[in-house]
């Protein structure tokens, strides 16, 4: 058991979803409500001013106003107010990865050298003087499942670990450190345009401390705000031990997704799309799908076609530069039985490795992230002349709400001695309109091993 100081205020509530904040102050007709008021109640003529106040396209604000889960407050920002799912809709929990021996789950980092941070705060947090609750003090209790506020038991620590893995995978193609270790205040707050070290705090707590009657809240598009960054901290993710680690991560990634400028992915009259077959969008409600990804609305009757992977970098979380060559020229050498690793950062990214095979059986294994992977791998083997020996992309099948098979790729065959190239790329599966997904956001971390003999 790991002792941790927790704020004790009780533990209540379920969580799912997202919030974003925007406030309206109209200085001339048509006037807008002072707030908090449903965005849908704002006169159509006033939405232009709302858009200007938030740096959003007016078409996007109009789309947000067509739903029932955004409101305007008194701080010139928009926030969403998500419905809490009934208990029977909570995702079926599957066994997730265990914590490796010796691992401190409160010192995890996905990219420790990054200047951007997403801090997953499970230990309780107090805020005051911010835009939340008009500056009144808010005391959020720690994530807790056993009523013991003084320490995290093994089950609680496991949820922290799994939520970290899944959130880190969602942001793995971006230059940002997802961490459970509390950073210095300066690593979160941004003080002006010249401050290049900043981020956001996501508070994971079982209690609806903002009184929204919802499952989470976060301001939209404020991750890189240079003028009043601290006013819009933190993001809130309301979750308890009834959620799997993946479901907790879905809330975190959804809420911090609002921070980096994203709105909701719905379908038809539904503001939140729950997905189809094995897939769902992060900015929808993909809690019940084993594969969740960023989206650009390729499914049928999508309410939003915003390009998530372009919008996120516009708000300070830039896409990683390519870590491995895309062709045989400059391919990364891979030694026998040693593991190579990389990130497929974009739909166009292909990572190429070179392997000297001694002849006989050649075995190659490409694995995505070990938990809640976003990357569906295609593995291609070519000989020294560039001729394709094999292309491996197994079908994807659901195991449960948290896991799917077929995201990995493996090869085993007798081949002549020589140098072979092994290519890893992200691909889609099925028809993205109705039962699958494209390669658009089939991105993320992987490991690659090869063995002769």
What residue spans do the PLM features occupy?
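Acidic/polar, solvent-exposed loop segments in beta-strand-rich repeat domains
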Residues: 131-153, 292-297, 372-373, 430-441
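Low-complexity, Pro/Thr/Ser/Gly/Ala-rich linker/spacer regions in secreted
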Residues: 33, 95-96, 100-103, 316-326, ...
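Active-site-proximal segment of zinc-dependent metalloprotease catalytic domains
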Residues: 112-116, 123, 130-272
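Secretory targeting and sorting signals
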Residues: 1-29
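Primarily auto-inhibitory N-terminal propeptides
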Residues: 19-146
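Residue-level recognition of alpha-helix boundary/capping or hinge positions
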Residues: 245, 249, 253-255, 260, ...
